[in-house]
Amino acid sequence: MRYEVLTQTLPDNFDWRKQKVVTEVKDQGKLDVSDVFAVVGAIESCWAIRTGNLNTLSEQQLVDCGRNETSANLREVFESVSSLGGLAPNSSYPYVAQHQQCKLNKTEISVRIEGHLKMHNEEAMARYLMAKGPFVVAFNGKDSLASYKGGIVNFNSTQCPPTKLSQAGLVVGFGVEAKMPFWILKNSRGGKWGENGYFRIARGSNTCGIASNVYSPFFDVDIGGPNIFVAM
């Protein structure tokens, strides 16, 4: 792989939903699998950006075949996608919100990834988002979203310790409201939760650990061109 320097000027607002490359908000139900939904969402969106094909992919495949139920282990979920050879469509392996025996037919896999990369810096995250697509984050969801109805989550590190990563989400955009920068995240609690299934959280100060555990997929179409980045 080669390195790409991302130096584009950041606008005040950017949202991949406007480009029709984000699938509808899903509902994980009773299972603690927000990391699975976030990773699948990132693969769906990033694949759509690269190919023009927005496919709804299977979370149930990862629940059944991928890894044990945990709270926010993003790297392990990406590794499961790679080891299984990719993801099947949701239509062939639909979500049922419970654990089953693995039923994966590998001939049905429709999207494969080459691997995943990790980010740290929120400036780099914003530049990457614009250049490459949505990515997944782990954060302290217990303290940040317990009573969320809308608005921008903006707690200090005492109110929402950044080391207690308990949930994952898909970052699809960013913006500024009343001089407060924020991230836009897709949750997996259905479209009636929060702001039509999404929530906003303060950007620039690692609020609730939002910049502590950040990953994105990359694909075979990225190989041969620059796909690891340095933000300036």
Protein language model regions, located:
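Catalytic-core signature of thiol
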Residues: 1-232
